Amino acid sequence: TVQPALSGWFGHEAPFAFDLDFRPMPGKIDRMRIGTPSIAAFSLLDAALNIWDHVDMEDLQKASIELSEAFIGEIEARCSDLKLASPRDANQRGSHVSFEFEHGYACMQALISEGVIGDFRSPNIMRFGITPLFLNLNDIKQAVVILEKILVTKAWAKPEFQKRALVN
């Protein structure tokens, strides 16, 4: 079997497992992919990034912090089963907010089924990306209302939310 000379997450057997050791995909040419996008993809990216020419990053960060703080406050007020896993200090946190919940995977699947998109990290972390480019305060409040409903009704306990999906 030919082994890749360079390793990259595109060719990893489990690219989203975040393992420190590289394990190439078994028996596939994909194992040779290293993680560098093609020139054509970069040219499209260049065009897409033009929108950032007129965005003030300080204003964007300020709005992100305001939305994140509102999200944390709403969850802590309405969803006592969740525990903040992210740093409380906004300067240490960035635009992701994470909460611990014993049934985090199933709860995230229930949220996704309701149109609230976040992701899950083992063993029990529910992670949300908070960006003012796509979200506003009403979106944040509505997401927490949906989360609260899922927790109160234990909708996360439904069988369809228990089965773990595989990431390919």
Residue positions per predicted region:
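Active-site C-terminal subdomain of aminotransferase-like
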Residues: 1-63, 69
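Short, flexible turn/loop "capping" segments at secondary-structure junctions
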Residues: 25, 41, 89-91, 120-124
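Short, solvent-exposed loop/helix junctions and linker helices
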Residues: 35-39, 101, 137
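Short alpha-helical functional segments enriched in proximate histidine and acidic residues
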Residues: 51, 74, 78, 150
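Conserved PLP-binding catalytic core of the aspartate aminotransferase-like
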Residues: 65-72, 76-114, 123, 130
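PLP-dependent enzyme catalytic core of the Aspartate aminotransferase-like
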Residues: 110-168
